[in-house]
Amino acid sequence: ALKQAQADVQYAAAARAFNKGDMAECLEQFFRAIHSRYDIENPVPRRLIRRKLGIINTLKEQNKKLKEQMREQQERLRQYAHEYLLMGNECITQAHDIRAALANYDKALSLDPNYIDAWIRKGITLFNNKDYFDAENCFNTAVNLHPANFKAVYNRGKLRLKTENTEGAIADLDKATSLKPEHAGAHELFGDALLKAGKEVEAALQWRIAEELKKKKKQ
């Protein structure tokens, strides 16, 4: 009788643990209950098991639907962010309105904080406006998000060259020429950075590569 009562307590404890989401405790109590009284063939525990398994399946399906909804929402936000990026670009190319462009880039980033193109475009706009500190922060964010993104690395190197951070410029422009060896501008700026560091021979080599690439492009 004691074992029978103990089994009832353990089955109840297993059910409570399940309801709390503590699967480890649920299984522990369930196996203890089986050890106390083997009830698997009994209709009542079997119904309990089926009901709880049904809840698991329902939750899995709900979780799947929720993930799909979140994915669709994120996709919509990315699309809206892209539209704001395009509007920001138009503010620069057509209206020459830097403030409006930056506002659009900020809207794009509020919708998708990992939107690398928006960070880069914002950085370039700030750089052209001689706001070098904030521009570098934008490029830093872009590089952190995608260390192998050519535009992010190249533009940060260009900025660092402008702000006399020669060592940083050399590191970035060296990487940029590796990421995109056919980019003449990257080789040219890399040469400029090397010259500032007193490396005339290496600088001349990069300038020569840049000239060859420019000639090749004209052909």
Role assignments for model-derived ranges:
Residues 18, 92-93, 120, 127, ...:
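Position-specific recognition of the canonical hydrophobic site in helix A of tetratricopeptide repeat
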Residues 62-67, 93-104, 128-141, 163-175, ...:
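Structural signature of tandem alpha-helical TPR/SEL1-like repeats
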